[in-house]
From Swiss-Prot:
Organism superkingdom: Eukaryota
Species: Cryptosporiopsis sp. (strain 8999)
Gene name per UniProt: dmxR13
This protein's UniProt keywords: Acyltransferase, Transferase
Function of the molecule: O-acetyltransferase; part of the gene cluster that mediates the biosynthesis of the dimeric xanthones cryptosporioptides. The pathway begins with the synthesis of atrochrysone thioester by the polyketide synthase dmx-nrPKS. The atrochrysone carboxyl ACP thioesterase dmxR1 then breaks the thioester bond and releases the atrochrysone carboxylic acid from dmx-nrPKS. Atrochrysone carboxylic acid is decarboxylated by the decarboxylase dmxR15, and oxidized by the anthrone oxygenase dmxR16 to yield emodin. Emodin is then reduced to emodin hydroquinone by the oxidoreductase dmxR7.
Pfam families cross-referenced by the UniProt entry: TRI-like_N
Protein name: O-acetyltransferase dmxR13
Length: 458
């Protein structure tokens, strides 16, 4: 399989991974059909053996996250420490549980949130809960859910240690390990890079500027016991077929305003959903209220870091419109605005702003001061992250089951205004995960302009 690159686990997490608000797990579920029920024992053995091979070459994936030297006004240091020989593989068998849906039923329903609850199918909750937060925070945990006619394979990656791009690469490497394929020298190097010096700091002359203004954490008032109950929130998946995506992009290309004359499918779909969310909110807000799209971006290419780097290296772009302007703008104009935030030629581009954030974090004892969410107002703003480029639908993990038929993030605690583009299927479909207030979601479901292209599956 190739040998691991020698490195010291102690202090292995990079500076971006030192943010306490990243103490959470990112989950992704692969759904496979299983025709022969006698194959489950071979499946679990393949997975267990694959985790051992993965850990032999990338030992940090078998570690756990610890925090050291924290105290009053000091969030301490997050590190990866050795834990086990390999990440845990949890196996749960739901085949005799009549309340658990079959693979056929889940597929027929479109792999909805309602059938993929993290409390049941995932090895860790996304967000920490004081009453049940485990003392140990493994870097990676895998759960194999055996269901009638299928397998749900769920990965939970600790967010201080990896973003979704990094986690996607870890899963890609795990699939190779399950197939007993050797890792390339490039994979071994990029998967074991020393994270501490990966992003060069700005020199001592740098003074914090407006490029970080959006990432200063804003204290939120505690909920009042005398106030109204919090609004009910709803998660849903919306499916966009290859035809719908092509039509949306063609429509957007007619009104591009960014000089490069290029917008991506991600730009277009993110803009389309943001505009629709704004329309759903107009009845509740003044049309002059401002809304911001906070878009997570993989910044590896801006910093000369390999695309296969398995850690955390992301930042966020921010675009702001009034609600009225946003809903009235042509789709191409909004998509162009989102694209312009990725331009490496613009002043204070993502490379510089990421180095600035890393520099300031390195100088700051209390790293709760900064977060990617920063000034985001969930009631008005929109946070979106794209997993569309992950090769999830190409992975078979050597299980003899073929490629996955569905890849989804399991349902977790509702977070208003959060959206994800799921990995693109082999035929080009994208499932968009979205969480809104129930009343906004109801208006979105009735929005004919939106439902012309997107199909709700829940």
């Amino acid at each position: 399989m190739g040998s691991a690159i020698d490195f010291d686990l102690d202090g292995h997490l990079d500076i971006l991974g030192q943010q306490p608000l990243l103490q959470m797990y990112t989950q992704i579920c692969f759904a496979f059909p299983v025709a022969d029920s006698s194959s489950y024992s071979a499946i679990t053995k393949t997975l267990a053996d694959g985790l051992e091979r993965l850990s032999a070459s990338f030992p940090w994936v078998a570690g756990h996250i610890v925090n050291e030297d924290s105290g009053e006004g000091n969030t301490g240091v997050f590190k990866i420490k050795p834990l086990d020989k390999s990440p845990s593989l949890i196996v749960k068998d739901f085949r005799n549980d009549p309340s658990f849906p079959t693979m056929e039923a889940i597929k027929k329903a479109g792999f909805p949130f309602s059938m993929l609850n993290e409390d049941i199918i995932a090895p860790r909750k996304t967000l920490p809960v004081r009453s049940d937060t485990p003392e140990i925070s493994p870097v990676l945990v895998v759960q194999a859910d055996l269901i009638t006619g299928g397998l749900l394979l769920v990965f939970a990656g600790q967010h201080n240690a990896m973003d979704m791009t990094g986690q996607g690469q870890v899963i890609h490497l795990f699939s190779k390990a399950c197939r007993n394929e050797p890792f390339t020298s490039d994979e071994l190097v990029s998967g074991n890079l020393d994270r501490r010096t990966l992003v060069p700091l700005l020199d001592d002359s740098y003074k914090q500027g407006h490029e970080l203004a959006r990432q200063i954490s804003q204290p939120r008032p505690p909920p009042s016991s005398d106030g109204p109950p919090p609004p009910k929130l709803d998660w849903t998946y919306i499916l966009f077929s290859p035809t719908s995506l092509a039509e949306l992009k063609s429509l957007a290309q007619k009104t591009i305003t960014f000089p490069s004359s290029f917008i991506s499918t991600d730009d277009t779909l993110s803009a389309f959903v943001w505009q629709a969310v704004a329309r759903s909110r107009l009845p509740r807000f003044d049309a002059s209220a401002k809304t911001t799209c906070a878009r997570a971006v993989d910044v590896r290419s801006y910093l000369g870091v390999p695309s296969t780097y398995t850690g955390l290296l992301q930042n966020v772009t921010y675009d702001t419109f009034t609600l009225q302007k946003l809903v009235n703008e042509p789709l191409g104009s909004v998509a162009s605005a989102l694209r312009s935030g990725l331009d490496p030629k613009r002043p204070n581009d993502l490379g510089f702003s990421t180095r600035a954030l890393v520099t300031v974090l390195s100088r700051t004892l209390d790293k709760n001061t900064f977060s990617f969410g920063g000034t985001v107002n969930p009631s008005l703003d929109f946070m979106v992250s794209s997993w569309a480029k992950l090769d999830s639908y190409e992975l078979d993990f050597g299980l003899g089951l073929g490629k996955p038929e569905g890849v989804r993030r399991p349902q977790f605690q509702p977070l208003e205004s959060l959206g994800f583009l799921m990995p693109k299927t082999q035929d080009g479909e994208i499932a968009f995960a979205l969480c809104l207030m129930e009343e906004d979601m109801k208006r979105l479901r009735a929005d004919e302009e939106f439902t012309k292209y997107g199909v709700f599956v829940g």
